[in-house]
Amino acid sequence: MISCELPTAARSLMVSRNYLKREGKMSKTTARRQRRIYALLMVSCAIPSLAFAEISAADTEARRKSGTDDEVVVTAEKKVYQSVKAAEAVKYGNAVQVVTADDIRISGAANFAEMAQFLVKGVNVGYSPDEGEYTIRLDGGGDRDTLVIRDGVPLYDRGPALEDIWSSTTIDPHMIERVEVFRGGNSLFYGSNGGIGVVSLVSKKPDGTRKGEFGISYGSFQSREIWGNYAFPLDAEAKHSVMAYGSMQATDGPRIYNPKDFVDNVAAAGGVQEYPLNRNDIGLKYLWQIDKDTALRINAEYTESWFQDAFPDREIHSPNTVRYPIIDASFEKRWSPAIMTEVAAYFTNPKIWNTELYPDICKVPAGCLNPATNKTVPFGSYSGKVFPNGPFRGFGTSNQPRAGFKEMGMTVRNTVNIGEYLEFVAGLQSVKYQDDSAREFPVGNKANTTTGVFVDLRPKLPFSPDTAISVAVRTDFLDGSDNKTIWKLGFKQPVWGGVYVRGNGGTSYSLPRTTELNNETSTSVGNPNLIPEETKTYNGAIGYNGQFKDVAIALEVGGFKTEITDRIQGTTDFRIPAGNGFPARNTFFNNTALTRILGVTADVDVSVGRNWRLSLGYTAQDASLTSGLFKGEQINETPAWFINGTMSWMSDDQRLNLVLLPRMQGSEWSTGGLTVAGRPSIRKNFGNYTVVNATVNYFMGDERQHQIQLRIVNLFDEKYAERYGFGNQLYGSAFNRGEYTASSPKYFFGYPFEGKPRSFYVSLSTKF
């Protein structure tokens, strides 16, 4: 696992000699055991991240002038800023990776999912980045236990009625100053939903100086983008400054589904289509640098995205509009070298509007008249008409009400250093959210409030001053009389000659979403009896940091163990009987079987002078239920192993830069179809692929402030699937003619969400 002290991924090469081999004749237990043995043997030669921290007085003064208490880490001729939280996490045994704005810039990533897939180690992206719907999953976790936050604002979908909002899709990668990735349980400071990890985005901010950025891009699928930001002081002393920023992105999008996978009547009604995606945002940031140790920041932004999410088995037209306002503020005060206070608050109110049109099917044996052609349509075929999916997915004010939620929160965090032998962090966090959907939706707007208090004790051992120990506990007071107490332990011990040992562990929980508790639609019913998921995770590693002349290397090999109880899942067997005008529907339940995830990690970073950067991140994850029908089977959408990273070369004059970004992964499964004796009949492995992106960057100007970039996505044109879904023949002609029933294997089918084919993009950007 990578620490904050390591060099960043965009300046590195990921070279993999690791692979997992599964013999088809092996038992599942033997295969998993051999997979772990292969991983342990073969990753032992990996070399991960650089760590040579040094904070100078000049850096400290610059930090204070900018109104931040970020730490400065010097890694192989490059300074990397990181938050106090990240620096402390590394010190006390956590695995933390920092991805900088320069890393993102030379990668050319068009959205946050593309950035995370190739630059963030341990990440698997859920759903499809090209469809406008995706989530970030760390170390075998799911959407619920990897928390993405931006400047302290959680981008977690609380479950509005109608449709998921996919909050991470609103992120503009050009406005990211750095990404801090906390692997392992991190709910202590961040609250619910950080049970397996936290991906913290720190955005670009005003700092009292005059500066700006501007860029444009054009490429395959008529993709075009324009972005920029400009910051300037409001007074001569630069105590007050602002930054205005915004971007616009639009693309016709690549093909998502193979036309052969569409149900015949869906295709006949126009379901085979492009998948355009549009996103635009605008915002304003303000800094009041009260004095060198005190700063107040305020940000307001508004993002709108528009995308299609029609599927091959039903929708022929399904545009979504998301509008996402965010207001956040932070106050930082360093009272003395030993005491610091941080206060952060936010308010969000995302909303979504959704249209879903389905094909009308001729149910008359003698045939139907197509109103557009005045021709007779055969029995079971598309009639020429369409209808909205229920009363809330139409076009106008009468049949397209909004869905959404409101959320607000505040965190107060105090860091205190008491003398020579004790440091502690103490604070509180309060979060309140409620559904904000139109009254037509049967969800209710009851507010859910969680208030937590936490303390993190960091004793210093007089007999071992280099040993770092953290013992922390947090209690959350939920609505009613319920409360949750979680804990976290961490340590880091230097051994000798750059070798160290680290480890941490803790507990967390994840609350049910609003719609999982209360919603009622034509396909699903909420379950008010759901209880929170419980997560327990441990991870540890042994590492080495060293430098030999102009070659800097580091090694870390580790592992993790995660156990999830009462995991919240959706049914697939329509266990809610038909009634009240509804067909049979699905619901949600707590899976009583324990989910266990065992993982092996290895990270490598090598820096050779100012020319070469090589990086490697390897994660193997054996994730399965420990009992029941699916005992021992890899859980869905969790790769058995994967490797991601970069290889970067820079010319001697620091003008020409070549970058390769590979991602290689093993098996990844999806399960669905007809359920027989409690087991879905289709289990599809859609993994086992290698995708390589590449960029050519050329920097111009006296300060290399102008950049032209050629980006090639999927350099070798690999055919692969980002996701694998399942559909049925409800709108198929043969089914509607009665040739088979919904209990026939013919009724169900699977289909891949295709990965982006080889494509090209050119961008021009400048800093001023």
Walk through the language-model features, giving the residues of each.
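Flexible loop and strand-edge segments within Gram-negative outer membrane beta-barrel domains
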Residues: T251-I256, Q273-R279, D293-T341, A345-G390, ...
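Periplasmic-side early beta-strands and strand-to-turn transitions of outer-membrane beta-barrels
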Residues: S200, G208-T209, G215-S217, N229-T321
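A beta-strand signature from Gram-negative outer-membrane beta-barrel systems
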Residues: T170-E213
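Conserved C-terminal beta-signal and adjacent last beta-strands/turns
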Residues: A31-R32, R36-V43, A53, A231-D235, ...
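Extracytoplasmic beta-strand/coil segments of soluble accessory domains associated
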Residues: Y81, A113-P154
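Gram-negative outer-membrane beta-barrel transporters
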Residues: E420, F424-V425, L461-D466, K561-E563, ...
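Short acidic/polar hinge/loop motifs at secondary-structure boundaries
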Residues: V125, P154-R183, G228
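Membrane-embedded beta-barrel scaffold of Gram-negative outer-membrane proteins
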Residues: A338, E342-E356, P494, V501-R502, ...
